[in-house]
Amino acid sequence: MTPAPKSTFVLGHRHLLGIEGLSAADISGLLDLSEEYVELNRQVDKKRTSLRGRTQVNLFFEASTRTQSSFEIAGKRLGADVMNMSVSSSSMRKGETLMDTAVTLNAMHPDILVVRHHASGAVELLARKVDGSVINAGDGAHEHPTQALLDALTIRRNKGRLEGLVVAICGDVMHSRVARSNILLLNTMGARVRVVAPSTLLPAGIERMGVEVARDMREGLDGADIVMMLRLQRERMNGSFVPSSAEYFNYFGLDQKKLSYAKPDALVMHPGPMNRGVEIDSIVADGAQSVIREQVEMGVAVRMAVLEALARNLPNA
């Protein structure tokens, strides 16, 4: 068993429902703690006992591979008893409401609930009904805080900082909770954020979030330190937002030519899952500038840090 982390950071919130409301100090504290877990996860003995005796329930109402497995691994490496619950195996398929599910689970006294839901705001509503800590693993098009944190950790480890960097977020910004959480975090940490998308995939009033807006890749990637691609979220679209996948790739898909508009040492990022040949070319996704696989690695470390920081607030912690 490895020794306890050196960082004594405690998140001053009972839940992690979003990046909104976190201070720069909160974000830095979580990233610093995450750094310790990056190193731990590369060792043979990856176990700590921070969550020993605690119960973690992963409650996913949307399909997930990376996020759910990442949270499961994170909890188990910290010593928690982890239960995975999907909607297909829950009473909600039989008509039970989200609030009834929350009350039922709360009666079992879980310490931490990790929740993903297709409706924006659903995780916050659930958090009001439970006694333990709740982590938002993605709610509709609203927020995905741990994705933004792992993206920030990936950037900081490669660039040494967040402040002053030009980050281009490209693609389906309108339907992306990842985009929203990243914009909030990057603005808080002093980065310069630019969103790049056709008008049909930009939310009305996006400028009010403190971002620059570009409607073509040459303008959007000019001078960018980070190129963050987003997939087309067709499952959230109720109409035709792009003429075709081929035409979308022609104008907004990241290939080697478009990547050349950014700085020569720009990082290529993607939260996954990738639609190769739609928003990103395989040569770029698997190329020397890509840190997409590193993002997955950082995800486990960040989620361990979030679980640890919240657990320190729990009774008898």
UniProtKB/Swiss-Prot annotation:
Name the UniProt record assigns to this protein: Aspartate carbamoyltransferase catalytic subunit
Residues that bind L-aspartate: 94, 177, 231
Family from the record: Belongs to the aspartate/ornithine carbamoyltransferase superfamily. ATCase family.
A single GO BP: 'de novo' pyrimidine nucleobase biosynthetic process
EC number(s) on file: 2.1.3.2
InterPro entries reported in the protein's UniProt record: Asp/Orn_carbamoyltranf_P-bd (IPR006132), Asp/Orn_carbamoylTrfase (IPR006130), Asp/Orn_carbamoylTrfase_sf (IPR036901), Asp_carbamoyltransf (IPR002082), Asp_carbamoyltransf_Asp/Orn-bd (IPR006131)
Top-level division of the source organism's lineage: Bacteria
Assembly, per entry: Heterododecamer (2C3:3R2) of six catalytic PyrB chains organized as two trimers (C3), and six regulatory PyrI chains organized as three dimers (R2).
